[in-house]
Amino acid sequence: MTMPAGKYYLGDLCYCLHDVWDECCDLMFPPGTAVREVEGEFQLRDGRRFASFGTAYGDGEYRSSINTLHSVDSGSIGCILLSDIRDNQYSLEQLQELGAIVDFEAPFEVESDQGLLKFGPVLIETAPDYEDEELEA
């Protein structure tokens, strides 16, 4: 899936989409279906687009390849254009502390591959191989 170039919030979208969180949840967890979670790109009724992917281990903190720490309370990490954030519950500075503000100069691909979340060149590993880390210790 391709997202357009621009400045994005990259993190748990529950922090910046309070005003439409019920609609987001209905898109990601369609009511009346047995689907656990739908991942990928979504469009809100008002036309705003976002991408969201579930983390391998749910809530917690996950480090990115650009050395930002992403706090997660909804079990997912996504991206949305800063200009599409209308919820002011958190300031821009607070959102940066909870995730990252990334300026993508060109359209970028988003995907999830066995817990590795990819937002263009930014990677967030949500399923680290703890077994390998234990062997190295």
Annotated model-derived regions:
Residues M1-A137:
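Intrinsically disordered, low-complexity acidic regions enriched in Pro/Ser/Thr
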